[in-house]
Amino acid sequence: MGLTPDSLFKNINTFGLLFESLVIRDLRIYCDTINARLYKYRDSKNREADAVIQFEDGDWALVEVKMGGQKDIDAASLKLLEIAKDIDEEKTGKQSFLLVVTKGNLAYRRKDGVYVIPLGCLKN
């Protein structure tokens, strides 16, 4: 690809795609260790989440990946909450958690219950 740090900072869209790919790769590895499955999510309203984790017991978690700041984290959290409220847990299993993975350095749980975790904090 011929990418350098300078070229990535000049093309934030490509940088974002690579970051998302790295997060998905790491989530897939973690899912493999706990016998969970990782999928892309799109519903009948055409809403998407970057990933859905389905655990062995049928419970699930929705994940969004964001490189931006607080505005992007807020928007991603709202999106996850809106999607989750429309999922029929009688058919799918129960919601385990909602997660936004970021580039930051602080992990926390928001007042709305959504977890925000930097990629660097995801460890096996």
How should these model regions be labeled?
Residues M1-N124:
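A cross-kingdom feature that marks ATP-driven nucleic-acid transaction machinery
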